[in-house]
């Protein structure tokens, strides 16, 4: 029971067991997707993703977003098994008031959760923003011999995520910008609450994302750890954002409810939980975690600690060679504004003719932009009317020179708002977006999550 393959198998079975048990104990939740995605989740957290459980706020960590937030027990199980500050008792308290394991992941509640998800599609937009933040920070602070920012954003999305309009808006601009460090896994289980996706969903999704400018890949068996890792490696090697279709049977390996909507949004039932554990050759004990998995968690922690220590060495060398830039970096990451940021702001005398507030806003924005290097944003195709362009600064474009700061969002208000949330959550930047007030209705779901 000590080989890596066996540890992987134990971890996958543990994730499935915890997901069933937690939802059953809470008498509420979504067991089927965490069960089906256990191999993918474990591959990400144990092998592919660069992260350090002891330092969940490490600036150069890979970000992970569970866009299908209803599958939260997948993320909680992975955080626990990887050594984050989330105990087995926390998992036992799934969906209980005041617990660290709410029904959907919440950024400000649970260590290791990068963004609040639940409303489908938002996580894809958040991921676009995080990938944009990485590009901005790399252009602003990386120097020859000192690569401080070089990380990826991994997203797991469901059929429902892919149907939502915000996902298409976000995928469109991500492809246009060639955000090659954004990788989205699509859990193609062909099931929604109302039944098979045949009822509602018939387009060629891979062709759609290919048209958006993404690399598209496919893994036909979501249980195949080798195929999952190979697809991820191919994604990491491409300059385009990558969209990986993963076929999974929801609820696997439950003997009576797999591949049905019955495994989606309700407890399996105690009899089905026991039957599933028997199929897995797993103890029927609730919340069982084998002792052997301590070795797997230690491996994740050790690898993370090594990578974090290496980054700290690079940061120390950067401080010695570029002290002024390092001070700017510290301020950016802590959210501090530079000294004198509010000096010399324009003032506006009373004028009987009146001054449009958008013109005053534009003048102040440009005064701030000259002093706050992390100010990043733009308008949804209304820059001239909103006066939201920062003059003389580089735009976010695939081959732009300089530090990208102006964003031409296009007519994508919803994606703009979701990406702004991702930019803000990533840290190191101060994002903004602009449109007409009446069009802000298109942004409302993301504004609520902000």
Question: Can you name each region flagged by the protein language model?
Answer:
Residues 313-449:
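Non-catalytic terminal/interface segments that mediate subunit docking, oligomerization
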Residues 36-177, 389-390, 419, 423:
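Cofactor-binding active-site loop characterized by glycine-rich and histidine/acidic residues
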Residues 71-73, 162-164, 190-194, 225-227, ...:
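Flexible loop/turn segments at secondary-structure boundaries
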Residues 19, 30, 40, 75, ...:
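Buried hydrophobic positions in well-ordered alpha/beta secondary-structure cores of metabolic enzymes
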Residues 85-112, 195, 206, 212-215, ...:
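Anionic-ligand anchoring segments at beta-strand to alpha-helix junctions in alpha/beta enzyme folds, i.e.
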Residues 53-54, 109-110, 115-299:
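Glycine-rich ThDP/TPP pyrophosphate-binding loop and its adjacent helix/strand module
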Residues 14-28, 187-189:
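N-terminal capping segment at the start of a domain
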Residues 26-38, 64-70, 95, 105-126, ...:
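Active-site nucleophile and cofactor-binding loops and adjacent substrate-binding regions
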């Amino acid at each position: 029971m000590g080989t890596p393959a066996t540890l992987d198998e134990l971890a996958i079975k543990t994730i499935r067991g915890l997901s069933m048990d937690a939802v059953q104990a809470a008498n509420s939740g979504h067991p089927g997707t965490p069960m089906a995605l256990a191999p993918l989740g474990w591959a990400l957290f144990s092998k592919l993703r660069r992260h350090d459980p002891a330092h969940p706020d490490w600036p150069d960590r890979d970000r992970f977003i569970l866009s299908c937030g209803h599958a939260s027990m997948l993320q909680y199980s992975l955080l626990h098994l990887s050594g984050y500050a989330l105990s087995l008792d926390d998992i036992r308290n799934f969906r209980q008031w005041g617990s660290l394991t709410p029904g959907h992941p919440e950024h400000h509640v649970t260590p290791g959760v990068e963004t609040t998800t639940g409303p489908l599609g938002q996580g894809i937009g958040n991921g676009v923003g995080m990938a944009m933040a990485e590009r901005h920070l790399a252009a602003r602070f990386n120097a020859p011999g000192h690569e401080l920012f070089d990380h990826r954003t991994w997203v797991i999305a469901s059929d429902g995520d892919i149907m939502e309009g915000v996902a298409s808006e976000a995928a469109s601009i991500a492809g246009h910008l060639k955000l090659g460090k954004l990788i989205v896994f699509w859990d193609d289980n062909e099931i929604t609450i109302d039944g098979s996706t045949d009822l509602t969903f018939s387009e060629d999704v891979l062709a759609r994302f290919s048209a958006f400018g993404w690399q598209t890949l496919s893994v036909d068996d979501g249980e195949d750890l080798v195929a999952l890792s190979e697809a991820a490696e191919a994604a990491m090697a491409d300059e385009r954002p990558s969209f990986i279709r993963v076929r999974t049977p929801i609820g696997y390996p439950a003997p009576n409810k797999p591949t049905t909507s019955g495994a989606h949004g309700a407890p399996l039932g105690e009899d089905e939980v026991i039957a599933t554990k028997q199929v897995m050759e797993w103890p029927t004990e609730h919340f069982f975690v084998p002792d052997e998995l301590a070795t797997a968690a230690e491996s994740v922690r050790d690898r993370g600690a090594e990578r974090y220590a290496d980054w700290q060495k690079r940061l120390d060398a950067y401080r010695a060679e570029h002290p002024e830039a390092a001070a700017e970096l510290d301020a950016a990451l802590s959210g501090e504004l530079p000294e004198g940021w509010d000096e010399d702001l324009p003032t506006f005398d009373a004028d009987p003719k009146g001054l449009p507030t958008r013109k005053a806003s534009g003048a102040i924005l440009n005064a701030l932009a000259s002093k706050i290097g992390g100010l990043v944003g733009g308008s949804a195709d209304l820059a001239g009317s909103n006066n939201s362009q920062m003059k003389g600064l580089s735009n976010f474009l695939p081959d732009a020179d300089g530090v990208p700061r102006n964003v031409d969002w296009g007519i994508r208000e919803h994606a703009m708002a979701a990406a702004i949330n991702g930019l803000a959550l990533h840290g190191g930047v101060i994002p903004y977006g602009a449109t007409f007030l009446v069009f802000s209705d298109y942004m409302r779901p993301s504004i609520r999550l902000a």
